[in-house]
Amino acid sequence: MIEITVNDRLGKKVRIKCNPSDTIGDLKKLIAAQTGTRWEKIVLKKWYTIYKDHITLMDYEIHEGFNFELYYQ
């Protein structure tokens, strides 16, 4: 299990525990469960990289303590 921080830059900061084998789509569903938004509306970015739903955290080399930027579409 790794812990990831998600910040929407509007004051909401969420910590999520997940497995490295989880996909970005799975992570979005965990974020949606904690924030109360629909997972389809969540966009995860870091700088200018937009993370795709079907790729795993391990493939993106996301590790313990990683910070995502949370956007809504």
From Swiss-Prot:
One of its GO terms (cellular component) is cytosol. Residues 1-73 form the Ubiquitin-like domain. One of its GO terms (biological process) is protein modification process. PANTHER family: UBIQUITIN-LIKE PROTEIN 5. InterPro entries: Hub1/Ubl5, Ubiquitin-like_dom, Ubiquitin-like_domsf. Disruption phenotype: RNAi-mediated knockdown inhibits expression of hsp-60 when adults are exposed to conditions causing mitochondrial unfolded protein stress. The lineage of its organism: Eukaryota, Metazoa, Ecdysozoa, Nematoda, Chromadorea. GO terms for molecular function: protein tag activity. This is Ubiquitin-like protein 5. It is found in: Cytoplasm. The gene is ubl-5. Interacts with dve-1; the interaction occurs in a mitochondrial stress-dependent manner. CDD domains: Ubl_UBL5 (cd01791). Involved in the mitochondrial unfolded protein response (mtUPR). Plays a role in modulation of lipid metabolism in response to the citrate-induced mtUPR, acting upstream of transcription factor nhr-80. Induction: Expression increased by citrate dietary supplementation. Its main location: cytoplasm. Keywords: Cytoplasm, Ubl conjugation pathway. Gene3D superfamilies: Phosphatidylinositol 3-kinase Catalytic Subunit, Chain A, domain 1 (3.10.20.90).
